[in-house]
Amino acid sequence: SAIEKANAVILNEARSNPELQGMGTTLVAALDRGDSFTIASVGDSRAYLWAHGELRLITKDQTWVQEVGRPLGLDEETLQKHPLRHVLTMALGVSEALDVRLYDIQTEPGAFLLLSSDGLHGLVTPDQIQRILGDDLEVPNTLQEKCLHLINAARAAGGPDNITAVLIAAS
């Protein structure tokens, strides 16, 4: 797949250049299939579905918190303060073994996807995202304007970089 090829390219670059060793990246991508989307995810970049005025997380983070902490039964307060809370369990460019997670979701006109990096969803709460994506008269209406509003909200919350927001309207 294209994701596996990207992983191989990143690994080869890191192996051939010592300054790049240890680099990696997360990924979330969506394929529009008309009345549905197929979403691919590696790491902690996320896909959300906005439909009927509600925001729903589609992907599951590949992080220590999601894959180790929660199954151990640690409470949310402990997880939010845990020293391993930001540790990824999977990323492109880290290993030849790659766990690409795939999700298929049905959509309908008026719905859209939000693809985001942790620079956005790590700083802007789901409630804030929902308000920005909703029909609030204080928030611009086009998808491009909503993306800019999301990015500005992350910057206002202290996000210096790595803030990605992509909105894709359902067909």
Identify the meaning behind each predicted range:
Residues S1-S171:
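PP2C/PPM-type serine/threonine phosphatase catalytic domain
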